[in-house]
Amino acid sequence: MSIPRLKSYLTMFAAVLMLGQVLTAQAEEALPDFTSLVEQASPAVVNISTKQKLPDRRIAAGQMPDLEGLPPMFREFFERNMPQQPRSPRGDRQREAQSLGSGFIISSDGYVLTNNHVVADADEIIVRLSDRSELQAKLVGTDPRTDVALLKVEGKNLPIVKLGDSEKLKVGEWVLAIGSPFGFDHSVTKGIVSAKGRTLPNDTYVPFIQTDVAINPGNSGGPLFNMKGEVVGINSQIFTRSGGFMGLSFAIPIDVAIDVSNQLKKDGKVSRGWLGVVIQEVNKDLAESFGLDKPAGALVAQVLENGPAAKGGLQVGDVILSMNGQPIVMSADLPHLVGGLKDGEKAKLEIIRNGKRQNLDISVGALPDDDADIGTGAEGSAERSSNRLGVSVADLTAEQKKSLELKGGVVIKEVQDGPAAMIGLRPGDVISHLNNQAIGSAKEFTEIAKELPKNRSVSMRVLRQGRASFITFKLAE
C-alpha cells in the first residue's frame, strides 16, 4: 500500500472517530439533567397517610354473634342452643384502615394539594414533610368531580412549589414526578407528555395530561413538574390491565386544580357552569348526515326542559363547533369548557343547524349536584308500520311526552328484519327525529320514511331508557 493511500485511510478513520465523539457529546447534551430540579422541588413534596375507623364485623372467640337481622324463628333457635356470652353492642367493634398518598405545599402557611381519593372518608390525616416531621392536617374541602382535595397544616415559612401554566405544556416535553410509590418517600420518575386534553370515563370535567411517567400506588396526589421546576399537574390515575404501571399515566392540569382549590378555600365547595344538554360524538356518518365536511364538534342529542340551553335557543340536532372561540374538536371538549364557567357567565356558541352556521349567546347555569331525571318511555297507540325500515311504531301518549320532555315522537312496537334490526333498534325505543326532521306522530314517521334518500347516511334520534343519542344508517337501492 502506498504512503499517500495509507494517509488517506488514516484521515478517514480519524474523521469517523471525531464524528462519533461529536454525536456522543450531542446525545449527552440532549438528555436532561434533573438533579437541580429535584433538589429545588423536593422539600415542598409531602407524604400523606390517613386513618379511617370502620366497623369490625368479625366475631371474637366465645362472643355471641349479632342475631338482630335474623328472622325470629332462627334467632330463638340460636339463643337457646348457643352459650350465653355477652354480646358486643352494634358498632362498638372497630378496625382501622390506612391509606397512603402524596401531596405538595402551595403556600408557606400550610395549604396542601392532593387527590380526593387519597383522603376520602379519612378520620385522621397526617402530612409528613421532607425532614420527616409530621403534622396533623385539616381537610379544607374536596371536589370528587375533579379528584382534588385541599388540606391545611399549621406551620410558618414552609417550603412551597412553583406553579406553572398547564396550558403552555407541549406534547413531547419532559416532565418529572416526585411522590411516595408504595411508601418509598420522595421517589423520582421522569418521562414525556404523551397527549393533552384526555377524557377518562366518569371524569367529564378534567382534560387530563397523559404521560409515560412511572406512577404507582402512593404517587397519587403528587406533583408533575416541567423542566423549569414548575408544577403543571397532579398525578391522579393510571391505565393498567395488571394493577401496575403500563406506560399510561394521567395528571390533573394545575390550572384546573388551582381553580378548584381557590373555590374550596373561599366557599368550601366548587361551582361549575351547566348547559343542560346531552351530547354525543360526531362520527363520519353523522357528519355526512348533518352536512359537515368532516367529523367535528358536539352533537346535541337532548336539551333538558327549562335548562340554560333550552332558554338560549339551542335545539336537538345542533352541532356545537366552538365555545367562546375555543374549537370543539371532540364532544368531550365541551364539558371542560362549560364547567370552567360560573353561573350566569356567557357561552358564545358557534353551531351548525340544518347545514347553516350561526351563533348563540347562552347564559350558563350552575351544575346540579345530581343528574336530572329525564324519565323513561313506554308504549303508545295509533300504530303504523314502515316496510322500508322494518319497524312498527305508535304515537306517544301525553304522559310519555311529558316524562321524556318531548313535543312529539313515536315508540317502537315491533322490529322486523330490515334496517331497524341491523342498527339495533328494539321495542320500547322512542324515535323523536328522522333525517333531521322532528316527528310529531306515527303518521309523520311513515311519511318521512317513504322519502328517505338511498345510499346516503340518514340520522335517527333514539331515546332508550330516557337517554338520547343519534344513530345513522343507509338504505340500499
UniProtKB/Swiss-Prot annotation:
Localization: Periplasm
GO biological process, one term: proteolysis
Domain of life where this protein originates: Bacteria
Lineage of source species: Bacteria, Pseudomonadati, Pseudomonadota, Gammaproteobacteria, Pseudomonadales
Cellular component terms per the entry's GO annotation: periplasmic space
Similarity comment: Belongs to the peptidase S1C family.
Keywords: Hydrolase, Periplasm, Protease, Repeat, Serine protease, Signal, Stress response
Gene Ontology MF terms: serine-type endopeptidase activity
UniProt KW Signal keyword: yes
NCBIfam families xref list: degP_htrA_DO (TIGR02037)
List of residues binding substrate: G218, N219, S220, L275, G276, V277, V278, I279
Family matches, as Pfam families: PDZ_2 (PF13180), Trypsin_2 (PF13365)
InterPro entries noted in UniProt: PDZ (IPR001478), PDZ_sf (IPR036034), Pept_S1C_Do (IPR011782), Peptidase_S1_PA (IPR009003), Peptidase_S1C (IPR001940)
Organism: Pseudomonas putida (strain GB-1)
Name the UniProt record assigns to this protein: Probable periplasmic serine endoprotease DegP-like
Domain PDZ: start-end pairs: 264-355, 361-466
Enzyme Commission code: 3.4.21.107
Keyword Hydrolase: yes
Chief localisation class: periplasm
